[in-house]
């Protein structure tokens, strides 16, 4: 769910004498989950970075009630964790961020925690509300809808990739072609992602 790392490209080059082939097969929006009782409706990327780095610790600092912000996130082996850290937090996560094994667990925690905030794939928001996200103070806030993610208006959207050691041939090419076909992209949508 993340772009290949430079170190992984070097290993690929050393083992197969190639940099491989990157294929974008879907889009995803990393959404911010809030408890339904939380009055906050939108946050900027900078505010989210402040919240998840521990610089912003109270909801009143971002227009909410006077209560401590409780952080939930993905485990550090997750591509979502890495993407969110690199593109939103831009530093280390706050030590009090509770890491959980999957987006469903993050959603479940936020659902039960009035002052919780979590992040994960946009498809998993049952029982919580999405928080609209703004690039900065002067921008429009966008919810992670299909339209906003597909048009790149939603600021925390990413491609999901497949990597191959070489240009696909034979049955592998047929498989890739199917994934990128109308039928394959329909399946992408059915499982909660967005078509490329």
Name each model-derived stretch.
Residues 2-196:
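Exported/periplasmic ABC-transporter solute-binding proteins
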């Amino acid at each position: 769910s993340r772009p290949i790392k430079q170190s992984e490209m070097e290993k690929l080059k050393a083992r197969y004498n190639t940099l491989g082939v990157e294929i974008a097969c879907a889009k995803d929006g990393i959404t911010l989950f809030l408890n339904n009782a939380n009055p906050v409706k939108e946050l900027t990327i900078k505010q989210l970075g402040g919240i998840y780095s521990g610089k912003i610790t109270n909801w009143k600092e971002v227009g909410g009630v006077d209560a401590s912000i409780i952080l939930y996130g993905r485990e550090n082996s997750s591509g979502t964790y890495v993407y969110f850290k690199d593109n939103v937090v831009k530093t280390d996560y706050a030590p009090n961020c509770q890491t959980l094994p999957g987006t469903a667990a993050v959603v479940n925690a936020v659902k039960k925690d009035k002052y919780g905030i979590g992040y994960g794939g946009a498809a998993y928001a049952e029982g919580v509300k999405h928080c609209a996200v703004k690039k900065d103070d002067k921008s429009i806030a966008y919810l992670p809808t299909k339209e906003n993610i597909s048009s790149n208006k939603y600021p925390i959207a990413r491609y999901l990739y497949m990597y191959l050691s070489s240009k696909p041939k034979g049955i592998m090419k047929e498989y890739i072609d199917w994934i990128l076909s109308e039928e394959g992209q329909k399946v992408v949508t059915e499982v909660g992602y967005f078509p490329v």
